[in-house]
Amino acid sequence: MKLDIYLNYNGNCEQAFRFYEQHLGGKITMMMTHGEQPNQTNVPANWKQAILHARIEIGKTVLMGADVPGAEPMRSAYLTLRLDSDEEADRLYALLADGGQIFMKMEETFFASRFAMLRDKFGTSWMHPPRPPTFSAARPMLLSMEPASRFVFGTV
């Protein structure tokens, strides 16, 4: 079994995927507009350029998306970037935070040399731990977060 991710955008799917392709090293393998589908009978003229389906591969992850009328930013899920260096974490944090909303600025934590949480300008929520975190049995671990200002802790 393989689990892929499907994101809904409110008219900016193409811009988001092109941005991710350029800055996250992804490769767009499919992008179709509503105007390119075979039967366009029910497609409003102002929606023909909207993305019906897009697919991008980022590393070993497949991310799919579409423009959906009335789509809202992600609120209860985060895409997580596991990066190889603090420098790469800082670079991508700056790019994804530009025009977005920062929930937790990039900083050192008890579990990572760099960690951040944000929503980019396209409405996608991201977490940035540079490397997979390691926890000792006695240290607290962040279990869940929603809304962003309320943390729930446990131990591992």
Q: What is each PLM-predicted segment?
A:
Residues 7-60, 142-156:
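Core segments of cupin and vicinal oxygen chelate
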Residues 3, 29-32, 50, 57, ...:
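Vicinal oxygen chelate
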